[in-house]
């Protein structure tokens, strides 16, 4: 009888743990505003929606490191583009949706810093910037507090690095970042 009661408590504990971890794995949705250069002498405020379905795991980054070192850059880019961590969606961007291929959440004193990585793409239909082949990625940086509010930056032309700590970091950037403000966790 004691074994049944103990096993029942163990199953209840496991079920509670799994349900709480499932709640932690729910998608996060952020909204933000960005000042975007439009036609000459004008600037528009655009709203952006960012949905993060999951964050990059150590195993995924380790796999990318292995592919890069053993099979080369093109295979690395294929493996990188195969990862789907969420969507960067400019509202009113004429149907443009950019898939996020890498995502990290780094705890800070007041909240966390979220880094999102994708291959370089034009997300603003009104802009056609010059590109540099050395900076083939786009990085979105969100700095949010415990309540999910904060600021951020979009680095449209960035280079990335895979670290031995199994993370992806921005190595440098070519053009000045666009400032995000009114960043809010909406879901």
Task: Enumerate the predicted regions with their spans.
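Boundary at the C-terminal end of the N-terminal hydrophobic targeting segment
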Residues: 22-27
């Amino acid at each position: 009888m004691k074994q049944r009661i103990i096993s029942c408590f163990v199953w209840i504990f496991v079920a509670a743990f799994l349900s709480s971890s499932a709640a932690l794995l729910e998608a996060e949705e952020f909204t933000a505003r960005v000042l975007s250069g439009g036609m000459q002498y004008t600037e528009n405020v655009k709203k952006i929606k960012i949905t993060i379905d999951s964050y990059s795991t150590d195993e995924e980054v380790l796999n990318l490191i292995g592919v890069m070192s053993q099979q080369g850059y093109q295979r690395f880019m294929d493996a990188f583009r195969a990862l789907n961590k969420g969507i960067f969606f400019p509202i009113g961007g004429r149907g443009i949706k950019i898939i996020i291929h890498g995502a990290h959440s780094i705890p800070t004193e007041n909240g966390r810093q979220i880094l999102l990585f994708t291959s370089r793409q034009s997300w603003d239909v009104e802009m056609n910037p010059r590109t540099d082949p050395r900076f083939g990625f786009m990085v979105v940086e969100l700095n949010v507090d415990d309540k999910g509010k904060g600021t951020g930056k979009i680095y449209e032309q960035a280079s990335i690095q895979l670290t031995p700590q199994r993370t992806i970091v921005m190595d440098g950037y070519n053009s000045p970042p666009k400032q995000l403000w009114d960043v809010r966790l909406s879901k």
